[in-house]
């Protein structure tokens, strides 16, 4: 049965699924950086281990190391079945109070989740082997894993290859890109960004920020991984770094949706080694410092750009959609509404069908749970499509009254890969339009004909189907819909 279903679905999976030779689909080439500016004092490597027996030559062990101790912060999945590396890394950060971290080691091909005490011991061994190779004290490294749930790591193979990973550390663009490849599962392209920035206290000093992430689609509900690592050579105290990361993630990795499921392994971490010099960014007291505010903005913008690459790689997706909720009486209520729209199968399928069905959008607004009383008032609510080319918005509903829609223009707008939906709540019951603080923004993709085959292929005997899994992996990613903490 599985074999026949596999054969039936083989020709239906998304046409841009990466083949086993690691070739990047032509439609995704534009997202691959050809160069980068990387933070001082960090070195990285991507090494082949063969965590999965089917992977005979592609990198599946990533190592990110700093020459000097780092401040570190992380947010983790809220899933009750938290993977061993999540538990170990959280304990490491807590015991060190976010200080003195030297490396992050990541394997793909096995999630090391729901693996009992043995899995916890494996995660500890991975971190300590990196510490040993680096010549630093134990528990100086964070550990992440991604892949199949419920299977033990081939820990001996991994431990044997960590010295190679350490000896091949480098700071070149090629090394960073290869490291980003090593954390991929069903991703069709490695997700890597870098940039430079300045801070008010040192306007003539350049700082650098780099980050990588992985994620693309679903294999089993609540059973896969979104991972991300950010590195900067700015000096930031741990408390400030944790606060900045939490703010950034709430507006980036916690504001994207592909299939609305919560993973066992989701982890986003940031390391700051201070190698660029300058003043240390500290947590705000009564008011935020100029450096803190500036860095928070830089990291948030960067995390948004990085997380959006995940949506652009969504399994079965043909569109990249921004939903913006404006003039909500409070940010969190607006964010809940944006999240509900982003997760609605009816909205997703309407967009795939290029149907300007604003009723489905309005329906999602109306049934959103947990919003403050008086947030949604029908006669104050408006819905529009905002074209990405900057042309005039297409109004669909204004203050609860339907507009006469130019169907031809709507069709043209919906032909584009990128689209923005704008929902204006008009300030809610109080009618305080423009006084609701920042816009709540979510990014999501549509559901196409290819979604079900793409998801189903991952469930059946996928190793019977050659050439369907990106980078030689049978694993998949699921986005964390509940907030990382």
Curated annotation (Swiss-Prot):
One of its GO terms (molecular function) is glutamate N-acetyltransferase activity. GO terms for biological process: L-arginine biosynthetic process; ornithine biosynthetic process. The record marks 224-225 as: Cleavage. Its main location: mitochondrion. Keywords: Acyltransferase, Amino-acid biosynthesis, Arginine biosynthesis, Autocatalytic cleavage, Mitochondrion, Multifunctional enzyme, Transferase. Substrate binds at residues 185, 214, 225, 315. Pathway: Amino-acid biosynthesis; L-arginine biosynthesis; L-ornithine and N-acetyl-L-glutamate from L-glutamate and N(2)-acetyl-L-ornithine (cyclic): step 1/1; Amino-acid biosynthesis; L-arginine biosynthesis; N(2)-acetyl-L-ornithine from L-glutamate: step 1/4. Heterodimer of an alpha and a beta chain. This protein may be expected to contain an N-terminal transit peptide but none has been predicted. Catalyzes two activities which are involved in the cyclic version of arginine biosynthesis: the synthesis of acetylglutamate from glutamate and acetyl-CoA, and of ornithine by transacetylation between acetylornithine and glutamate. This is Arginine biosynthesis bifunctional protein ArgJ, mitochondrial. It comes from Penicillium rubens (strain ATCC 28089 / DSM 1075 / NRRL 1951 / Wisconsin 54-1255). The lineage of its organism: Eukaryota, Fungi, Dikarya, Ascomycota, Pezizomycotina.
């Amino acid at each position: 049965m599985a074999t026949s279903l596999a054969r039936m679905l083989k020709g239906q999976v998304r046409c841009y699924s990466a083949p086993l030779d690691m070739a990047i689909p032509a439609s995704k080439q534009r997202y691959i950086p050809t160069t980068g500016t990387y933070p001082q004092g960090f070195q990285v490597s991507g090494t082949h281990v063969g965590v999965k027996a089917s992977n005979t030559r592609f990198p599946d062990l990533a190592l990110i190391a700093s020459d000097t101790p780092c401040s570190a912060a992380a947010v983790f999945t809220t899933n009750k079945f938290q993977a061993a590396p999540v538990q170990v890394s959280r304990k490491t950060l807590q015991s060190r109070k976010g200080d003195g971290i030297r490396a992050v080691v990541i394997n793909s091909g096995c999630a090391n989740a729901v693996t009992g005490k043995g899995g916890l011991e494996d995660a500890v061994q991975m971190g300590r082997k990196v510490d040993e190779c680096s010549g630093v004290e134990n528990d100086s490294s964070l550990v992440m894993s991604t892949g199949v749930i419920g299977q033990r790591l081939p820990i001996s193979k991994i431990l044997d290859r960590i010295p190679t990973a350490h000896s091949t550390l480098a700071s070149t663009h090629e090394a960073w890109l290869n490291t980003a490849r090593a954390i991929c599962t069903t991703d069709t392209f490695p997700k890597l960004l870098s940039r430079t920035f300045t801070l008010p206290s040192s306007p003539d000093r350049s700082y650098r920020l780099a980050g990588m992430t992985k994620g693309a689609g679903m294999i089993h509900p609540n059973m896969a991984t979104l991972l991300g690592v950010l590195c900067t050579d700015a000096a930031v105290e741990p408390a400030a770094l944790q606060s900045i990361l939490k703010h950034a993630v709430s507006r980036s990795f916690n504001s994207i949706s592909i299939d609305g499921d919560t993973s066992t392994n989701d982890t986003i971490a940031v390391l700051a080694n201070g190698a660029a010099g300058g003043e240390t960014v500290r947590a705000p007291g009564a008011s935020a410092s100029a450096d803190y505010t500036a860095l928070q903005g830089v990291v948030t913008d960067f995390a948004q750009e990085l997380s959006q690459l995940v949506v652009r790689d969504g399994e079965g997706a043909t569109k990249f959609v921004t939903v913006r909720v404006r003039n909500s009486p409070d940010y969190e209520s607006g964010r809940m509404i944006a999240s509900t729209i982003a997760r609605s199968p009816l909205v997703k399928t309407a967009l795939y069908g290029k149907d300007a069905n604003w009723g489905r959008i309005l329906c999602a607004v109306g049934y959103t749970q947990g919003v403050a009383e008086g947030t949604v008032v029908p006669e104050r609510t408006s819905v529009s499509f905002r074209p990405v080319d900057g042309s005039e918005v297409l109004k669909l509903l204004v203050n609860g009254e339907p507009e006469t829609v130019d169907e031809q223009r709507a069709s043209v707008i919906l032909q584009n890969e990128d689209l923005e939906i704008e929902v204006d709540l008009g300030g809610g019951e109080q009618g305080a339009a423009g006084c609701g603080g920042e816009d709540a923004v979510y990014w999501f993709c549509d559901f196409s004909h290819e979604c079900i085959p793409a998801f189903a292929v991952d469930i059946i005997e996928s190793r019977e189907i050659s050439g369907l899994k990106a980078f030689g992996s049978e694993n998949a990613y699921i986005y964390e819909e509940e907030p990382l903490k």
